[in-house]
UniProtKB/Swiss-Prot annotation:
The lineage of its organism: Eukaryota, Metazoa, Chordata, Craniata, Vertebrata. The gene is NTRK1. It comes from Gallus gallus (Chicken). Residues 175-262, 281-347 form the Ig-like C2-type domain. InterPro entries: Cys-rich_flank_reg_C, Ig-like_dom, Ig-like_dom_sf, Ig-like_fold, Ig_I-set, Ig_sub, Kinase-like_dom_sf, Leu-rich_rpt. LRR repeats lie at residues 71-92, 95-116. GO terms for molecular function: ATP binding; nerve growth factor binding; nerve growth factor receptor activity; neurotrophin binding; neurotrophin receptor activity; protein homodimerization activity; transmembrane receptor protein tyrosine kinase activity. The active site is at D633 (proton acceptor). This is High affinity nerve growth factor receptor. GO terms for cellular component: axon; early endosome membrane; late endosome membrane; plasma membrane; receptor complex; recycling endosome membrane. Receptor tyrosine kinase involved in the development and the maturation of the central and peripheral nervous systems through regulation of proliferation, differentiation and survival of sympathetic and nervous neurons. High affinity receptor for NGF which is its primary ligand, it can also bind and be activated by NTF3/neurotrophin-3. Upon dimeric NGF ligand-binding, undergoes homodimerization, autophosphorylation and activation.
Amino acid sequence: WGCLRLPLPLCHALAAHCRCPASHTLRCREPLTVSSLSALLLGAHRPTDVIIENQALLTSLTRDDTRMLWDLRHLTISNSGLQYISDDAFQDNHRLSHVNLSFNALTSLSWKTFQHLPLQELTLEGNPFNCSCGIRWLQLWQNGSRAELGNQSLLCWEGSMLVALDSHPLHDCEPPTARIEHPDVVLRQGDSVNLTCHIWGEPSATGEWVLPHVGSEPSVTKLSEWELVLEINNISSSLNHKDLTCRAENSVGLAEDSVMLNVTFPPVILLLSEAIPQHFWCIPFSVDSNPTPRILWLFNGSMLPEGPYIHTRIVEYEPNSTVLHGCLQLNRPTHVNNGNYTLVVQNPLGRAARSIQGRFMDNPFSFSPEEPIPVSISPLGTRNSSLEGPVETADEHTFGVSVAVALAVFASLFLSVMLIALNKCGHRSKFGINRSAVLAPEDGLAMSLHFMTLGSSPVSSTESKLDGLKSNFIENPQYFCNACVHHVQRRDIVLKWELGEGAFGKVFLAECSHLLPEQEKTLVAVKALKEVTENARLDFQREAELLTVLQHEHIVKFYGVCTEGDPLIMVFEYMKHGDLNRFLRSHGPDAKILDQGQGQPCGQLTLSHMLQIATQIASGMVYLASLHFVHRDLATRNCLVGHDLVVKIGDFGMSRDIYSTDYYRVGGRTMLPIRWMPPESILYRKFTTESDIWSFGVVLWEIFTYGKQPWYQLSNTEAIECITQGRELERPRTCPSEVYDIMQSCWQREPQQRSIQDIHSRLQALVKTPPIYLDILG
């Protein structure tokens, strides 16, 4: 059989005179062995290339012969007896692009046979065509070099003379024309329309109207050989933006003219679904209207004002349609946004409305944070139950004053006794009393802001078995200068939406009244504690005291706490651009890829911008080092970006949830950011201000790689091996050598050789005179 790589069923199905020299190729060359293509391919696999030559018995080709060749791309029938090809011979061969019909017995050939094909090459040399209107289309194609016909020498018989087709005049053989005479086609739903089509051609042309589904039955009237009138009554909105086409054709070719109807109608709500969580929450809807409708929303029956955080977004326009697909987009909605949402669409012709319930989260409070907190008063006597409220008597007033005075005297005596006792107990320390900060068991990184540890805090296996890790704080006016934690009234806090969630609880964007004297309302980030155990409350209190101490322009500002009821709340300043890692990625060269083409493109950070960011973080680190505070988790994910590229150190405790791949779990609960840790911290769990400097070097590397993960090509175990063996991160392509030298200064093997003051000074110098950097690797 001589078959190579062809599926076995095809080889068995072919006649013995055909060959399959390549996969999916059929070749029949032995003379007088093929009379029908359909019989040859019966029951066979479908080839993509068919080559038939020297077959005088093969005289016709119809749709029945080719209907099973769905994958046919190349067809050759040459040196055969082919005389006739039907108009629909290739109706089912939508991939056919190369046709060779050379040296057959074709005297005529219709353009209709090839009109729907993606034809790249049509070979017709050696056929005895008659010079007639039936091959005028070939002359036009040849003169226009379509389907490679311009490179062929086609001949036709004019009587007994064989002439060149491309230059032979074929009289009275022209393609038809079609023209729709139409009035103003802006119609209202329910109107009627009459359209007249004028057709012409030589030889004479036939005409027809090609219509979409129009609902009511259209009427077509033939006024003459040249005029067709279309009448449609009770126009439907489904005809809006639909084409009505008049088609004329003759033996030379085809002509069409179309008109698009513009049907106006009142708005219709096609879809309104329940809210679905995406990167944001979306209440999806679809509406249809012409003209374009006004879209607005009601929330619990009142007008919903739209802004940057709640707004309507059209996500898709259907081509040649008035249907709009969109959603009401809610960024980080909270329980405040739960309620009834009504979509209202209207245009000059009418109005439509539909409602749906939206529920985004449960109320994290036992009461509405927008309402005043009820204060319960234990009755000291008979209360007035009238609507005017309680009436205070003179006796009650005298009694109240007496109680207040007695309490004040008692408090003074108690404080005096406590001070004497403290002085006696503390005589062994020349600095005074000791204070301890207890971290969560087995998790030195459990606190949301890691300013809990002073100086060095090595973690041993023995200590990990204790109930908590204790570090002694030296009494110093800088640390505990009678720091008074500011208390914020819960009624002054109005939650807007959730920013994120961590192991401790949730962080919300909120609006706080009376927080700053120069502003009536201030946007803040609110951290709500999930646990309400006694240990959690103690940790909350200690953290609040420490955060109150930290006051620096590049440390996230702590405003205070709210302890009225549950949950316990910490209030921080709000940094509008979020964490630095995402900010770097969205302003880097791969921003469009990471965003998947969505959203507005951000400008790419320059060398000057990156140096400014690094210097600000270094400034915050100098401040922490001066207080001997150890951060323990310094990374771009734990820095926040505000207005005008202001960068501050801070961490709301969400990073271990959002950036979980940046942490390595040790034992049961401990999550360590090993890619940012120096060898002494990995090997001995020793965290110092010097270990923070190592982490700062990695932060520099993150900045100059636009937020890439350190050692991103390695697993956590492989990264640990590289760090402990002394390998360093490679210099980023966008990083000048002067900056890489600073990184390497942070990665000195000996901790005492790392100096944050020196690093900060060098960065400040680079900001003033940025290095000239040429990207020779790019």
